[in-house]
């Protein structure tokens, strides 16, 4: 049984705590209020005092209600997505703690291909992208330890305001793009798989984790409607008519690396995951 520290008590962090098997490993989650993980000395002491073996970093800046907030809070976005995760990574490296960092695949845009881990980001630091995307690319460029798991548009079978399904349900104006998405319970199972099998994280390095066979927004809302989760105010509009502080990433990620490295790990298609989530979601 390994001692696993989950840093960040937001949507993904709390979801991991809800889905992992507590009988397999000793999981503990901390928020920044409980442990100021921006303070290297405090984090260093905490890790030693609790014999931590793994850190899963789910902390970061995503923006509320969306990434546009990063344009007015650039320093905070940079600190939370670059500076603090690098500090955590450096401490893990010093103490030989296994480090899993949950990041984003929103550093690509366009449909000329399914983007792999080997592709140079085209929506990152050196492109006309958002501060959020630039910060995610910057961390990948600077980090040299542990593994980075890229997710996109996470969703679950709950009515959490951070879930992709909840966001779509509450929007009145929609734009139709095909995007990769991550079913959070599958992500949780993958993290547990890495820990259970004591996988060498340096081999994993950077990996895309999204459910295959991405659907576009219209396909998703059609599916939502079939399960009774429809919004009568939904209207599809031209993206050019929407006011956004920063451009958005729209893309499909490849999971060839995932299926090649871990052929025994089963991941369901996006539609299968959406079917399950929509069949079980309860709208408040």
Regions found by a protein language model. Give the residues of each.
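N-terminal Rossmann NAD(P)H-binding glycine-rich loop of SDR-like oxidoreductase domains
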Residues: 2-22
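Adenosine-cofactor binding site in Rossmann-like domains, unifying the SAM/SAH pocket
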Residues: 27-46
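SDR active-site strand-loop-helix element
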Residues: 7, 30, 55-59, 99-105, ...
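Mid/C-terminal beta-alpha module of Rossmann-like enzyme folds, strongest
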Residues: 197-245, 249
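Catalytic helix-loop patch of NAD(P)-dependent Rossmann-fold dehydrogenases
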Residues: 72-79, 83, 107-149, 156
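NAD(P)-dependent short-chain dehydrogenase/reductase
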Residues: 129, 140-193
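NAD(P)H-binding glycine-rich loop region in Rossmannoid oxidoreductase-like domains
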Residues: 40-82
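Amphipathic terminal alpha-helices
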Residues: 268-284
